[in-house]
């Protein structure tokens, strides 16, 4: 069985302990798994603004009493895999976001130089060398350890099937960032909350942001960036994220059409 298929049915460890979150509303416990660059910061702000008690999976390891054995409502939130990949590049690479997300380089001059070289790559280099060729190679056990150098950064472009226990969770709701304005009212009502409750739209940038693109949404730049890639690269990216595309009914068509229009 292929690794990604096996991961759909069995997950020995939760891969992303800092975005998988238990939260409580009116004596009911719920759970959301959302990926990095897939709206996780917006949910953090939503919990804080509405004083919703929440506990990350990472904190459950320290005190299992903080986390329930079962959840009333289980949620997975996703985003188009290619839009999320570009959002990752803009944040970590173009705008230098990697510097504040991995402190290991601060005490290791060689690692710092390696990271500077890696995260200075152009968009086509990132796609070809880092994603397709897997230049930032980290063993799977180390990748599941968020304190291992580079693992937290690489998780930003890890597929959904790897990050969330997709089928094991049996989610009650699958939210998409693209349809969130329509999805949220239904979800909020299921929580017993007002359907028009404000949900923040948080866009995280890095310390090197020169604001050449402003704090604008990534979808505005899809054509600018993906038109720099070859058909082979886009198809190879699709192979890497194929399970995510098929699971959540996303399409590659418009990305291929961009190349045909050039």
Please name every model-derived segment.
Residues 1-262:
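Membrane-interface amphipathic segments in extracytoplasmic regions
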């Amino acid at each position: 069985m292929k690794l990604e298929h096996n991961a759909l049915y069995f997950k020995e460890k939760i891969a992303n302990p800092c975005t998988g979150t238990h939260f409580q509303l009116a004596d009911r416990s719920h759970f959301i798994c959302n990926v990095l660059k897939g709206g996780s910061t917006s949910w953090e702000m939503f919990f804080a603004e509405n004083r919703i008690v929440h506990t990350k999976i990472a904190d459950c390891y320290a005190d299992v009493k903080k986390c329930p054995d079962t959840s009333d409502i289980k949620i997975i939130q996703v985003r188009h895999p290619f839009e999320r990949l570009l959002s990752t590049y803009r944040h970590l690479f173009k705008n230098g976001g990697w510097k504040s997300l991995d402190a290991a380089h601060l005490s290791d001059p060689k690692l710092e130089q390696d990271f500077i070289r890696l995260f200075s790559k152009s968009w086509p280099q990132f796609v070809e060398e880092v994603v397709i060729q897997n230049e930032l190679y980290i063993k799977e056990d180390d990748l599941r350890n968020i304190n291992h150098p580079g693992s937290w950064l690489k998780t930003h472009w890890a597929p959904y099937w790897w990050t969330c226990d997709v089928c094991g969770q049996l989610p009650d709701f699958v939210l998409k960032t693209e349809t969130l304005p329509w999805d949220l009212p239904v979800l909020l009502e299921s929580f017993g909350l007002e359907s028009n409750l404000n949900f923040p739209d948080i866009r995280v940038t890095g310390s090197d942001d020169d604001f050449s693109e402003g704090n604008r949404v990534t979808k505005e730049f899809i054509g600018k960036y993906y038109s720099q890639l070859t058909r082979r690269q886009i198809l190879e990216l699709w192979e890497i994220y194929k399970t995510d595309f098929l699971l959540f009914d996303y399409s590659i068509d418009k990305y291929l059409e961009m190349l045909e229009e050039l």
